[in-house]
Swiss-Prot record:
PROSITE patterns cross-referenced by the UniProt entry: ASN_GLN_ASE_1, ASN_GLN_ASE_2, ASN_GLN_ASE_3
CDD domains xrefs: GatD
GO-annotated molecular function: asparaginase activity; ATP binding; glutaminyl-tRNA synthase (glutamine-hydrolyzing) activity
Recorded family membership: Belongs to the asparaginase 1 family. GatD subfamily.
Start and end residues of each Asparaginase/glutaminase domain: 84-413
Species classification: Archaea, Methanobacteriati, Methanobacteriota, Stenosarchaea group, Methanomicrobia
Self-association and partners: Heterodimer of GatD and GatE.
Region: Disordered, residue numbers: 56-78
Gene3D superfamilies xref list: 2.30.30.520, 3.40.50.40, L-asparaginase, N-terminal domain
Name of the protein this chain belongs to: Glutamyl-tRNA(Gln) amidotransferase subunit D
EC annotation from Swiss-Prot or TrEMBL: 6.3.5.-
Described purpose of this protein according to its UniProt entry: Allows the formation of correctly charged Gln-tRNA(Gln) through the transamidation of misacylated Glu-tRNA(Gln) in organisms which lack glutaminyl-tRNA synthetase. The reaction takes place in the presence of glutamine and ATP through an activated gamma-phospho-Glu-tRNA(Gln). The GatDE system is specific for glutamate and does not act on aspartate.
Length: 424
């Protein structure tokens, strides 16, 4: 029999019956998505196939046939007229991914409109305008990507958006969130959201995360934040400041945590209630300011015992403009590294020191090594995360090439990256 993608079919094989929607399939095979959310594939010549719905239309001509089977051509809901206006900008990543049936791998193919169609609950929260900025996995983001994204966000705010949601791959989302935190001072919420598991998987977190992100986008939290699962259950999402968040697990749904700070707050998935735990910038409190410009020739170097200090020479001799060094404990490196650190700062290359511990604060005044590092010109990163310190360095050097001015800016708290008192 003939069938096509989107048809609802019954498949009988060895006395077992399967029902589902036809998905893209290889020649000679049929793949269906069952109600459970799982996919199943069969060799066509080894099964009996019965058509139940013709692309959402039953055999007697009625629509949907009670199965709730929706096709990719389903129209988006008409936006309400009195709801807040939210721009949703898609950059790719797992939240905008699905299975590539050619390879069996996950690929970034969904657009912002696809996300809106797949999560109809969003239409009850706001009027959404979808826009694709890129369709890449987040490991392919770079400083140019951050600037293009920030420009698009500013354009949406200037056009009257009450909030902006950025869908993003989780692996480097903290870098992008930090970058926009430094480039944009915003009067409205800018919310990064992603998912750890693609929409094809029954355990996908994309719908809950997107709904919670929408709640934050219409709130009065006018900062760049990351909204992701707070636990492994579907109970609430956490709201993390863009400069204080880190992905701390490869695959758990609650992989993102605030470091050296409490989260800004939480969003209850069931009620939509937002609770806040720390001070934050409120909607309309600041005027929109946009300062793009990133220096890409900066590097993050991790110190390890016995590491050859001449690794720093590579960056000095190849025209790099700044370095972040991840030291041990309170921010230490081998004494053998200190002459190279001095060589870098003598070359007017700012060097920020952070800690591999992540939690806690840098203090290079306790031990002799730390004091020698300060004498060599090292800048203490305080309780800034290494990744945030790198992005901050890139942004500062994109604003000025004056060494002393840059060093002064790097010692300041510019976007919540340094806390006066480390809370965690």
């Amino acid at each position: 029999m003939e069938f096509k993608q989107g048809d609802w079919v019954r498949i009988e094989r060895n006395g077992t019956v399967y029902e589902g929607k036809v998905m893209p399939s290889m020649e000679g095979y049929i793949t269906i998505k069952m109600k459970s959310g799982y996919n199943a594939g069969f060799s066509i010549d080894k099964v009996r196939i019965t058509l139940l719905e013709n692309n959402g239309e039953t055999a007697n001509g009625s629509r949907n046939g009670g199965k709730g089977c929706k096709t990719n051509e389903e129209e988006l809901p008409e936006p309400g007229k009195k709801l807040p206006k939210i721009a949703i900008l898609s950059t790719g990543g797992t939240i905008a991914s699905k299975i590539d049936y050619r390879t069996g791998a996950v690929t970034s193919q969904f657009t912002a409109d696809d996300i809106l169609a797949a999560i109809p609950e969003l239409k009850e929260i706001a009027d959404f305008k979808g826009r694709v900025i890129s369709s890449i996995l987040s490991e392919n983001m770079d400083s140019d990507s951050w600037q293009n994204l920030s420009k698009a966000v500013v354009e949406e705010i200037e056009a009257g958006a009450d909030g902006v949601i950025v869908t993003h791959g989780t692996d480097t989302m903290m870098y992008s969130a930090a970058a926009l935190s430094f480039m944009i001072k915003t009067p409205v919420p800018i919310v990064f959201v992603g998912s750890q598991r693609s929409a094809d998987r029954p355990s996908s977190d994309n719908a809950m995360n997107a709904i919670c992100a929408a709640r934050v986008a219409i709130s009065d939290i006018a900062e760049v934040v990351v909204v992701m699962h707070g636990t492994t259950s579907d109970d609430f999402c956490e709201i993390h400041r863009g400069t204080k968040v880190r992905k701390l697990h490869t695959s758990r749904r609650d992989a993102f945590k605030s470091v050296n700070s409490l989260p800004v707050g939480t969003v209850d998935y069931g009620t939509g209630e937002i609770k806040t735990f720390i001070d934050y910038t409120r909607r309309g409190e600041k005027a929109l300011k946009f300062k793009p410009g990133m220096e890409p020739k900066c590097a993050l170097v991790k110190f390890t015992p016995g590491a050859d200090p001449t690794v720093l020479d590579y960056y000095i001799s190849n025209g790099y403009k700044g370095l972040v060094v991840e030291g041990t404990g309170l921010g230490h490196i081998s004494t053998k590294w200190i002459p190279l650190l001095r060589k870098a700062t003598d070359a007017k290359m700012p060097v920020i020191v952070t800690s591999q511990c992540l939690n806690g604060r840098i203090c290079d005044r306790v031990y002799d090594t730390g004091r020698d590092m300060l004498k060599a010109g090292a800048i203490e990163g305080e309780d800034t995360l290494p990744e945030t310190a790198l992005v901050k360095l890139m942004w500062v050097l994109g604003q000025t090439d004056d060494f002393e001015k840059a060093a002064g800016m790097l010692r300041e708290d510019l976007s919540g990256e340094i806390t006066e008192c480390t809370q965690r």
